[in-house]
Protein backbone atom coordinates (compact mmCIF):
# COMPACT_ATOMS: atom_id res chain seq x y z
CA UNK A 1 0.00 0.00 0.00
CA UNK A 2 1.23 3.51 -0.82
CA UNK A 3 2.31 5.40 2.28
CA UNK A 4 0.54 8.44 0.86
CA UNK A 5 -2.82 6.68 0.65
CA UNK A 6 -2.32 4.69 3.85
CA UNK A 7 -2.34 7.83 5.98
CA UNK A 8 -5.65 8.93 4.46
CA UNK A 9 -7.21 5.56 5.27
CA UNK A 10 -5.72 5.50 8.78
CA UNK A 11 -7.16 8.92 9.55
CA UNK A 12 -10.56 7.74 8.27
CA UNK A 13 -10.42 4.88 10.78
CA UNK A 14 -9.46 7.29 13.55
CA UNK A 15 -12.41 9.56 12.80
CA UNK A 16 -14.82 6.61 12.78
CA UNK A 17 -13.43 5.10 15.98
CA UNK A 18 -12.72 8.17 18.11
CA UNK A 19 -14.64 11.05 16.54
CA UNK A 20 -17.15 12.98 18.60
CA UNK A 21 -20.78 12.82 17.55
CA UNK A 22 -21.72 16.34 16.45
CA UNK A 23 -24.69 17.98 14.79
CA UNK A 24 -23.84 20.43 12.03
CA UNK A 25 -25.19 23.22 9.85
CA UNK A 26 -26.60 20.73 7.31
CA UNK A 27 -28.58 18.80 9.98
CA UNK A 28 -26.93 15.57 8.82
CA UNK A 29 -24.71 14.86 11.83
CA UNK A 30 -21.05 13.87 11.83
CA UNK A 31 -18.24 11.92 13.43
CA UNK A 32 -15.72 14.70 14.06
CA UNK A 33 -12.16 15.19 15.30
CA UNK A 34 -10.27 18.46 15.66
CA UNK A 35 -6.71 18.81 14.47
CA UNK A 36 -5.09 16.38 12.02
CA UNK A 37 -2.24 16.43 9.54
CA UNK A 38 -1.15 14.33 6.55
CA UNK A 39 2.07 14.68 4.54
CA UNK A 40 2.23 13.60 0.89
CA UNK A 41 5.62 13.18 -0.76
CA UNK A 42 4.91 13.87 -4.41
CA UNK A 43 8.09 12.10 -5.50
CA UNK A 44 6.28 8.86 -4.61
CA UNK A 45 3.47 9.51 -7.08
CA UNK A 46 0.53 11.84 -7.50
CA UNK A 47 -1.77 11.43 -4.46
CA UNK A 48 -5.07 10.64 -6.13
CA UNK A 49 -6.75 7.91 -4.09
CA UNK A 50 -6.92 4.46 -5.65
CA UNK A 51 -9.18 2.71 -3.11
CA UNK A 52 -12.05 4.40 -4.95
CA UNK A 53 -12.22 6.22 -8.27
CA UNK A 54 -11.79 9.98 -7.91
CA UNK A 55 -12.87 12.16 -10.84
CA UNK A 56 -9.62 13.88 -11.82
CA UNK A 57 -11.30 15.82 -14.63
CA UNK A 58 -13.44 17.64 -12.08
CA UNK A 59 -10.37 18.41 -9.98
CA UNK A 60 -8.64 19.90 -13.03
CA UNK A 61 -11.57 22.06 -14.11
CA UNK A 62 -12.20 23.31 -10.57
CA UNK A 63 -8.57 24.37 -10.12
CA UNK A 64 -8.52 26.08 -13.53
CA UNK A 65 -11.73 27.84 -12.45
CA UNK A 66 -10.01 29.04 -9.28
CA UNK A 67 -6.99 30.26 -11.26
CA UNK A 68 -9.27 32.24 -13.57
CA UNK A 69 -10.44 34.20 -10.53
CA UNK A 70 -13.97 33.07 -11.36
CA UNK A 71 -16.79 32.58 -8.88
CA UNK A 72 -19.59 31.73 -11.30
CA UNK A 73 -20.35 28.04 -11.85
CA UNK A 74 -21.02 28.48 -15.59
CA UNK A 75 -17.39 27.62 -16.41
CA UNK A 76 -17.68 24.42 -14.36
CA UNK A 77 -20.94 23.43 -16.02
CA UNK A 78 -19.38 23.99 -19.44
CA UNK A 79 -16.84 21.34 -18.40
CA UNK A 80 -19.56 18.97 -17.09
CA UNK A 81 -18.50 19.61 -13.50
CA UNK A 82 -21.39 19.74 -11.04
CA UNK A 83 -19.56 19.73 -7.70
CA UNK A 84 -20.61 23.31 -6.88
CA UNK A 85 -24.20 23.18 -8.16
CA UNK A 86 -26.04 22.64 -4.90
CA UNK A 87 -25.26 25.93 -3.17
CA UNK A 88 -26.27 28.27 -6.03
CA UNK A 89 -29.29 26.02 -6.63
CA UNK A 90 -30.26 26.49 -2.98
CA UNK A 91 -29.98 30.26 -3.39
CA UNK A 92 -32.36 30.10 -6.35
CA UNK A 93 -35.03 27.85 -4.81
CA UNK A 94 -35.08 30.00 -1.67
CA UNK A 95 -35.55 33.20 -3.69
CA UNK A 96 -38.79 34.99 -4.56
CA UNK A 97 -38.12 34.29 -8.24
CA UNK A 98 -38.47 30.52 -7.82
CA UNK A 99 -41.98 29.29 -8.70
CA UNK A 100 -41.52 25.50 -8.69
CA UNK A 101 -42.34 22.84 -6.08
CA UNK A 102 -41.05 23.29 -2.54
CA UNK A 103 -37.36 22.36 -2.36
CA UNK A 104 -36.86 22.86 1.40
CA UNK A 105 -34.08 20.57 2.73
CA UNK A 106 -33.66 19.06 -0.74
CA UNK A 107 -30.32 17.49 0.21
CA UNK A 108 -31.92 15.26 2.83
CA UNK A 109 -35.31 14.77 1.19
CA UNK A 110 -33.88 13.40 -2.06
CA UNK A 111 -32.39 10.51 -0.07
CA UNK A 112 -35.71 9.53 1.51
CA UNK A 113 -38.45 10.37 -1.01
CA UNK A 114 -38.18 8.95 -4.57
CA UNK A 115 -41.03 11.14 -5.84
CA UNK A 116 -39.39 14.26 -4.47
CA UNK A 117 -36.05 13.12 -5.90
CA UNK A 118 -37.59 13.20 -9.40
CA UNK A 119 -38.98 16.69 -8.79
CA UNK A 120 -35.54 17.78 -7.63
CA UNK A 121 -33.90 16.41 -10.79
CA UNK A 122 -36.38 18.33 -12.96
CA UNK A 123 -35.76 21.61 -11.14
CA UNK A 124 -32.02 21.04 -11.13
CA UNK A 125 -32.04 20.54 -14.91
CA UNK A 126 -33.96 23.79 -15.35
CA UNK A 127 -31.44 25.54 -13.12
CA UNK A 128 -28.39 24.21 -14.98
CA UNK A 129 -29.87 25.06 -18.38
CA UNK A 130 -30.58 28.63 -17.29
CA UNK A 131 -27.09 29.10 -15.82
CA UNK A 132 -25.61 27.98 -19.14
CA UNK A 133 -27.89 29.97 -21.42
CA UNK A 134 -29.31 32.95 -19.52
CA UNK A 135 -26.68 35.60 -18.75
CA UNK A 136 -28.84 37.59 -16.35
CA UNK A 137 -29.93 34.48 -14.44
CA UNK A 138 -26.34 33.20 -14.32
CA UNK A 139 -25.08 36.51 -12.96
CA UNK A 140 -27.77 36.57 -10.27
CA UNK A 141 -27.81 32.93 -9.16
CA UNK A 142 -24.63 31.33 -10.52
CA UNK A 143 -22.09 32.99 -8.25
CA UNK A 144 -20.83 31.64 -4.92
CA UNK A 145 -19.49 34.86 -3.42
CA UNK A 146 -15.98 35.99 -2.56
CA UNK A 147 -14.24 32.67 -2.00
CA UNK A 148 -11.29 30.73 -3.43
CA UNK A 149 -10.44 31.94 -6.94
CA UNK A 150 -12.17 35.31 -6.58
CA UNK A 151 -9.98 36.07 -3.56
CA UNK A 152 -6.88 34.42 -5.05
CA UNK A 153 -6.96 36.74 -8.07
CA UNK A 154 -9.04 39.75 -6.98
CA UNK A 155 -8.55 40.38 -3.25
CA UNK A 156 -10.09 43.78 -2.46
CA UNK A 157 -7.41 46.46 -2.18
CA UNK A 158 -7.58 48.36 1.11
CA UNK A 159 -6.89 51.58 -0.79
CA UNK A 160 -9.88 51.01 -3.08
CA UNK A 161 -7.71 51.37 -6.16
CA UNK A 162 -8.09 47.92 -7.63
CA UNK A 163 -7.44 44.44 -6.33
CA UNK A 164 -4.55 42.19 -5.35
CA UNK A 165 -3.66 39.23 -7.59
CA UNK A 166 -2.26 36.86 -4.97
CA UNK A 167 -1.24 34.18 -7.49
CA UNK A 168 0.84 36.53 -9.65
CA UNK A 169 2.42 38.10 -6.58
CA UNK A 170 3.14 34.65 -5.08
CA UNK A 171 4.88 33.28 -8.17
CA UNK A 172 6.95 36.43 -8.61
CA UNK A 173 8.01 36.31 -4.96
CA UNK A 174 9.02 32.64 -5.20
CA UNK A 175 11.22 33.50 -8.17
CA UNK A 176 12.99 36.48 -6.58
CA UNK A 177 12.88 35.59 -2.87
CA UNK A 178 12.42 31.82 -2.45
CA UNK A 179 13.51 31.93 1.21
CA UNK A 180 10.64 34.22 2.13
CA UNK A 181 8.37 33.15 4.98
CA UNK A 182 5.58 35.20 3.46
CA UNK A 183 4.71 32.94 0.53
CA UNK A 184 1.06 32.93 1.56
CA UNK A 185 -2.18 32.39 -0.34
CA UNK A 186 -5.36 33.14 1.60
CA UNK A 187 -9.06 32.71 0.87
CA UNK A 188 -10.62 33.97 4.10
CA UNK A 189 -11.82 37.56 4.12
CA UNK A 190 -13.68 38.36 7.38
CA UNK A 191 -15.52 41.21 5.68
CA UNK A 192 -17.04 39.22 2.81
CA UNK A 193 -17.18 35.69 4.28
CA UNK A 194 -20.64 36.13 5.88
CA UNK A 195 -22.11 36.80 2.43
CA UNK A 196 -20.55 33.83 0.61
CA UNK A 197 -22.80 31.00 -0.54
CA UNK A 198 -20.38 28.60 1.18
CA UNK A 199 -17.44 30.25 3.01
CA UNK A 200 -14.03 28.92 1.99
CA UNK A 201 -13.13 25.62 3.67
CA UNK A 202 -9.48 25.49 2.60
CA UNK A 203 -8.58 28.93 3.83
CA UNK A 204 -4.81 29.40 3.74
CA UNK A 205 -1.71 27.94 2.08
CA UNK A 206 1.99 28.56 2.63
CA UNK A 207 4.75 27.65 0.19
CA UNK A 208 8.24 26.69 1.36
CA UNK A 209 11.41 26.40 -0.75
CA UNK A 210 14.58 24.56 0.28
CA UNK A 211 17.31 22.75 -1.68
CA UNK A 212 15.60 23.43 -5.00
CA UNK A 213 12.30 21.87 -3.91
CA UNK A 214 9.02 23.60 -3.21
CA UNK A 215 6.44 22.33 -0.72
CA UNK A 216 2.97 23.54 0.20
CA UNK A 217 1.06 23.39 3.47
CA UNK A 218 -2.68 24.06 3.35
CA UNK A 219 -4.94 24.68 6.35
CA UNK A 220 -8.53 23.53 5.98
CA UNK A 221 -11.00 24.74 8.62
CA UNK A 222 -13.70 22.20 7.69
CA UNK A 223 -13.15 18.92 5.86
CA UNK A 224 -15.83 16.60 4.47
CA UNK A 225 -13.55 13.61 4.76
CA UNK A 226 -15.20 11.16 2.37
CA UNK A 227 -16.26 13.42 -0.50
CA UNK A 228 -14.18 16.56 -0.14
CA UNK A 229 -10.75 15.62 1.20
CA UNK A 230 -9.74 13.32 -1.71
CA UNK A 231 -10.43 16.28 -4.04
CA UNK A 232 -8.57 18.72 -1.79
CA UNK A 233 -5.48 16.51 -1.59
CA UNK A 234 -5.30 16.16 -5.36
CA UNK A 235 -6.22 19.78 -6.09
CA UNK A 236 -3.51 21.30 -3.91
CA UNK A 237 -0.98 18.73 -5.08
CA UNK A 238 -1.83 19.82 -8.62
CA UNK A 239 -1.52 23.50 -7.68
CA UNK A 240 1.87 22.79 -6.09
CA UNK A 241 3.02 20.97 -9.22
CA UNK A 242 1.92 23.84 -11.46
CA UNK A 243 3.66 26.45 -9.29
CA UNK A 244 6.81 24.30 -9.28
CA UNK A 245 6.72 24.10 -13.07
CA UNK A 246 6.35 27.87 -13.38
CA UNK A 247 9.19 28.62 -10.95
CA UNK A 248 11.72 26.03 -12.12
CA UNK A 249 11.65 24.05 -8.88
CA UNK A 250 11.22 20.37 -8.07
CA UNK A 251 8.07 19.27 -6.27
CA UNK A 252 8.43 18.45 -2.58
CA UNK A 253 5.59 17.71 -0.15
CA UNK A 254 1.95 18.64 0.11
CA UNK A 255 1.12 18.96 3.80
CA UNK A 256 -2.59 18.89 4.63
CA UNK A 257 -3.53 20.36 8.01
CA UNK A 258 -7.17 20.06 9.01
CA UNK A 259 -9.25 21.71 11.73
CA UNK A 260 -12.64 19.95 11.89
CA UNK A 261 -12.21 16.64 10.04
CA UNK A 262 -15.59 14.95 9.84
CA UNK A 263 -17.39 12.01 8.30
CA UNK A 264 -21.08 12.66 7.76
CA UNK A 265 -23.41 10.07 9.26
CA UNK A 266 -24.76 9.26 5.80
CA UNK A 267 -21.21 8.59 4.54
CA UNK A 268 -20.26 6.00 7.16
CA UNK A 269 -21.25 2.96 5.10
CA UNK A 270 -19.44 4.33 2.06
CA UNK A 271 -16.17 4.99 3.84
CA UNK A 272 -16.32 1.56 5.47
CA UNK A 273 -16.71 0.11 1.98
CA UNK A 274 -13.68 2.11 0.84
CA UNK A 275 -11.64 0.85 3.79
CA UNK A 276 -12.36 -2.72 2.67
CA UNK A 277 -10.95 -2.12 -0.82
CA UNK A 278 -7.39 -2.77 -2.01
CA UNK A 279 -5.10 0.09 -2.98
CA UNK A 280 -2.84 0.45 -6.01
CA UNK A 281 0.34 2.20 -7.04
CA UNK A 282 -0.19 5.94 -7.33
CA UNK A 283 -0.46 7.50 -10.81
CA UNK A 284 1.95 9.95 -12.41
CA UNK A 285 1.09 13.57 -13.19
CA UNK A 286 2.23 15.04 -16.51
CA UNK A 287 2.07 18.78 -17.21
CA UNK A 288 2.65 20.30 -20.63
CA UNK A 289 6.16 21.81 -20.34
CA UNK A 290 5.42 24.35 -23.08
CA UNK A 291 2.88 26.27 -20.97
CA UNK A 292 4.53 29.60 -20.10
CA UNK A 293 2.11 30.92 -17.47
CA UNK A 294 0.10 29.26 -14.73
CA UNK A 295 -2.93 31.07 -16.15
CA UNK A 296 -2.52 29.49 -19.59
CA UNK A 297 -3.10 25.85 -18.64
CA UNK A 298 -5.97 24.13 -20.42
CA UNK A 299 -7.57 20.82 -19.51
CA UNK A 300 -5.51 19.03 -22.17
CA UNK A 301 -2.25 20.32 -20.66
CA UNK A 302 -2.80 18.29 -17.48
CA UNK A 303 -2.68 14.51 -17.78
CA UNK A 304 -2.61 11.56 -15.42
CA UNK A 305 -0.83 8.35 -16.38
CA UNK A 306 -1.34 4.84 -14.99
CA UNK A 307 -4.28 5.64 -12.73
CA UNK A 308 -5.42 2.20 -11.52
CA UNK A 309 -8.34 2.43 -9.10
CA UNK A 310 -11.30 0.68 -7.52
CA UNK A 311 -14.88 1.57 -8.46
CA UNK A 312 -16.69 4.83 -7.76
CA UNK A 313 -18.40 4.92 -4.35
CA UNK A 314 -21.29 7.39 -4.44
CA UNK A 315 -22.52 9.40 -1.48
CA UNK A 316 -24.93 12.35 -1.04
CA UNK A 317 -23.51 15.82 -0.57
CA UNK A 318 -24.46 17.74 2.57
CA UNK A 319 -25.71 21.21 1.62
Curated annotation (Swiss-Prot):
Swiss-Prot/TrEMBL catalytic activity: dUMP + (6R)-5,10-methylene-5,6,7,8-tetrahydrofolate = 7,8-dihydrofolate + dTMP
InterPro entries reported for this sequence: Thymidate_synth/dCMP_Mease (IPR045097), Thymidate_synth/dCMP_Mease_dom (IPR023451), Thymidate_synth/dCMP_Mease_sf (IPR036926), Thymidylate_synthase (IPR000398)
GO cellular component term of the entry, any: cytosol
Active site per UniProt: 201
Pfam families in the record: Thymidylat_synt
CDD domains associated with the record: TS_Pyrimidine_HMase
Residues reported in the UniProt entry to bind (6R)-5,10-methylene-5,6,7,8-tetrahydrofolate: 224, 318
Highest taxon above the source species: Bacteria
UniProt keyword terms in alphabetical order: Cytoplasm, Methyltransferase, Nucleotide biosynthesis, Transferase
Sample GO molecular function, one term: thymidylate synthase activity
Residues binding dUMP, per UniProt: 25, 181-182, 221-224, 232, 262-264
Pathway listed: Pyrimidine metabolism; dTTP biosynthesis
Similarity section: Belongs to the thymidylate synthase family. Bacterial-type ThyA subfamily.
Function: Catalyzes the reductive methylation of 2'-deoxyuridine-5'-monophosphate (dUMP) to 2'-deoxythymidine-5'-monophosphate (dTMP) while utilizing 5,10-methylenetetrahydrofolate (mTHF) as the methyl donor and reductant in the reaction, yielding dihydrofolate (DHF) as a by-product. This enzymatic reaction provides an intracellular de novo source of dTMP, an essential precursor for DNA biosynthesis.
Protein name: Thymidylate synthase
Organism annotation: Oenococcus oeni (strain ATCC BAA-331 / PSU-1)
Gene from which this protein is expressed: thyA
Amino acid sequence: MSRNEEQYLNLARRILETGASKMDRTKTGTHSIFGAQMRFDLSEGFPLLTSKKVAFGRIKSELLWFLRGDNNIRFLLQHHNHIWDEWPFKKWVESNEYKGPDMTDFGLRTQKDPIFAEQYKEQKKIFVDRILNDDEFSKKFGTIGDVYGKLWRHWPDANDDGSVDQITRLINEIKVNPNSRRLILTAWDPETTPFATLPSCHVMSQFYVVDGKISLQMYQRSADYFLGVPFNIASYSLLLSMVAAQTGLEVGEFIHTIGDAHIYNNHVDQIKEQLSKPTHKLPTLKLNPDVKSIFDYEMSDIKLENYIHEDVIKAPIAV
